[in-house]
From Swiss-Prot:
Keywords: Acetylation, ATP-binding, Cell membrane, Chaperone, Cytoplasm, Hydrolase, Membrane, Mitochondrion, Nucleotide-binding, Nucleus, Phosphoprotein, S-nitrosylation, Stress response, Ubl conjugation. The modification Phosphothreonine is found at T5, T7. A motif (TPR repeat-binding) lies at residues 724-733. The modification N6-acetyllysine is found at K58, K84, K444, K459, K490, K586. ISGylated. S-nitrosylated; negatively regulates the ATPase activity and the activation of eNOS by HSP90AA1. GO terms for molecular function: ATP binding; ATP hydrolysis activity; ATP-dependent protein folding chaperone; CTP binding; dATP binding; disordered domain specific binding; DNA polymerase binding; enzyme-substrate adaptor activity. The modification Phosphotyrosine is found at Y314, Y493. The lineage of its organism: Eukaryota, Metazoa, Chordata, Craniata, Vertebrata. It catalyses: ATP + H2O = ADP + phosphate + H(+). It is found in: Nucleus; Cytoplasm; Melanosome; Cell membrane. InterPro entries: HATPase_C_sf, Heat_shock_protein_90_CS, HSP90_C, Hsp90_fam, Hsp90_N, Ribosomal_Su5_D2-typ_SF. This is Heat shock protein HSP 90-alpha. Belongs to the heat shock protein 90 family.
Amino acid sequence: MPEETQTQDQPMEEEEVETFAFQAEIAQLMSLIINTFYSNKEIFLRELISNSSDALDKIRYESLTDPSKLDSGKELHINLIPNKQDRTLTIVDTGIGMTKADLINNLGTIAKSGTKAFMEALQAGADISMIGQFGVGFYSAYLVAEKVTVITKHNDDEQYAWESSAGGSFTVRTDTGEPMGRGTKVILHLKEDQTEYLEERRIKEIVKKHSQFIGYPITLFVEKERDKEVSDDEAEEKEEKEEEKEKEEKESDDKPEIEDVGSDEEEEEKKDGDKKKKKKIKEKYIDQEELNKTKPIWTRNPDDITNEEYGEFYKSLTNDWEEHLAVKHFSVEGQLEFRALLFVPRRAPFDLFENRKKKNNIKLYVRRVFIMDNCEELIPEYLNFIRGVVDSEDLPLNISREMLQQSKILKVIRKNLVKKCLELFTELAEDKENYKKFYEQFSKNIKLGIHEDSQNRKKLSELLRYYTSASGDEMVSLKDYCTRMKENQKHIYFITGETKDQVANSAFVERLRKHGLEVIYMIEPIDEYCVQQLKEFEGKTLVSVTKEGLELPEDEEEKKKQEEKKTKFENLCKIMKDILEKKVEKVVVSNRLVTSPCCIVTSTYGWTANMERIMKAQALRDNSTMGYMAAKKHLEINPDHSIIETLRQKAEADKNDKSVKDLVILLYETALLSSGFSLEDPQTHANRIYRMIKLGLGIDEDDPTVDDTSAAVTEEMPPLEGDDDTSRMEEVD
C-alpha cells in the first residue's frame, strides 16, 4: 500500500471501532469461566504460552520454504512482562500473528467443535485444566483477567487490536500504537484479587510446572532495584528528577528512595581528602531471565530422566491435567537416525474417532526444528491416541506434505513407531491393573488395528481381552482361553451380541455350556469387524456359535444318536420348510440346543444377527448391499424338546392341519427374536400373540360384549389353530 494512502486512512481507522457479539456457545463458556470458582486458575498461563508456541511453530514452518517470512523479525521467542503499577500481565510472542479475519473468527465468532463438549465436561465435574484439550484455551485468560487486549500483526495484514471485558461482545480496531513487526501481544488486565500472577516467584513457579519444555525461549521481564554509588552532585540531580516525576504523577507523598551511607563512612571520607563525597541511591532497572533453559527432553539419555520429568513434559506437550499411563523413550541409529518419545494417555479424548480431527498427535521435528503436528503418514489411524515427539536426523528441513507422502524415510520411521507402540502395550499388559485401565479406554483401537493392520495382526490379537462363559467378571486373553481348552476341542468358540447378559443367556451357547466348553463373549460392535479378519489364533480357528455347521467334540455314540434323531425328524423338517418357504434356506435338526425349542442360525459367510442389526443402524447404509449380505437363515429345531416332539406327532397325523402351519410360523418368528433378528412385520406377530392370550383367557371371539373396535382388530388378526378354511395364513404373510 502506498504511504500516502496509509496516512490519509489513518485518522478514519483510528476512530473505526467495530463491535462483534460472541457466538452463543463461547459467551456461555466465558460466563461459566467467570462466574464459577476454580482453585487452579494458574493454568491460564500455560494455555497462553502454549498458543504462543503454536504461533511460533507456524511461522518457523512457513519460513522453511520462504525465508523472507522472517524479515519482519528473525528472533522467535516468548516474553512475559508483569506490570504492578498498571496491574497487567503481558504475554508477547513473535509468532505468525493474526489477520483481522483470524482475530474475529478465532477469538469469538466461530465456536470450535470442543466448546460445547468442554462445557458439558465442566458441568459434569471435569477439571478446568482440561480446557486446552478442547481447543478453547485462550478463554482461560478470563479466570484471572477482567479485561483482555490482544494486539497482533500478521505479515499479510495491518496491526489490529482486539479487546473484550467478556460482556457478550468484543471490539476490533486498527492499532496505531508501537509497531510490532510480527506476532501477538496478549495484555491481561488482572482482577484486583489476582495480583499474585504479577509476582516474579509465582510466574517462575507456573512456567517451571507447566511450560519448561516449550521449544522457544520464555523470558521474564521484571523491574528491580539495585544500589548505585554516585557522587553528591549526581545524587542531587537524581533526587530533583525524581521529585519532578513524582509531582507529575501527583505522588508527592512518597519520598525519593535515597539511602544515606553511615556516619562512619563519612568520617573516613573526610579523612581522605582526595576522594569526593559519595552517596548510595536505589536505581530501577529491567531484569531479563530465561525461564526454560532445559534442553529438549527427548535428546537426553532415558536413564537420566525421572518419572516426574516425563510427567511434566507430557503435560506441557498435551495440556492434559492427568499423568500419562505409560511412556516409551527410544532412539534408532544406523542407516536411519531418529529419536522418539511416546506416551499413552490415561483416558481417550472425547473426539477420538471424529473424522474432522487431526489424524495423530505426534509432533514431527527435524534436527530439533518443529515441522508439523498432524503428519498422517507418521502413525496409523488406530494408534491416533498416542502422544509424543519424533525427531529425525535424515529428513530435509523444508520438507513438504507431498514429499512426506512419498518419503521412504518416513515409512521406516512409521514401521518403527508401530513396533515400539506394540512393545509398550505388551509391557503394559504385564501389569494387570494398569492394563485394565488402558483396555477400557483403547480396546476399540486395538480391534481397529486387527481389522486394518494385517502385518501386526498376530501381535495385536495377543492384546485382546474378553469376558467368557467361564471367566466371571474378569476379562481374559485368547492365550488364557487356549490353555483352558478341552483335550478334544479343536476350535475357539465365540458369540457376538449387545450385552454380556444377553449372550450368556442365548440359546446358541446352551449345549456348549452343558459340555463345559468355554465361549468368548464379544459385545462391542467393532468385534464383528475384528473377527472378520481374525480367522485364527495359535493355529486354532475362531468359530461363531451362531452360524451353521457348528462342530462340537462328540464321541461315536453321540454321533449315532444324532443321526437317529435326524432320521426321525426328517419329515417334520420338510413340512416346516414347505410352510416357511423362502423365509428360510433350510430346516435341520440342531446339535446346539438344550432348553430352547428352536433357533435361527446364519450361513458361514453371511452376517450374524448382531452384524445385521449394526448395519441396519448405519445412517448411510446401502440398501442394495443389505439384500445380498443379509445372511441366509437356517431354522434349527431341538429334537429333545416337547414342543417339537408334539408338533412332529401332530404333523404326521395330519400334515394339512391348519394349526400346524400357525404354530410353525409362530415358532419361527419367536426364534427370530430370541436369535437377535428383528421382525419385518412386528404387528402381525403381536396380533398372533394377542389371539393366543384371548384363547388362554377363554375369551370367545363371537362374544357380543366385545366392542366394535376390538372386533375390527380381530378381523385383521391372523388365524390360529382350529379356525375354519375361510381364514388364510397365506394372505397375512
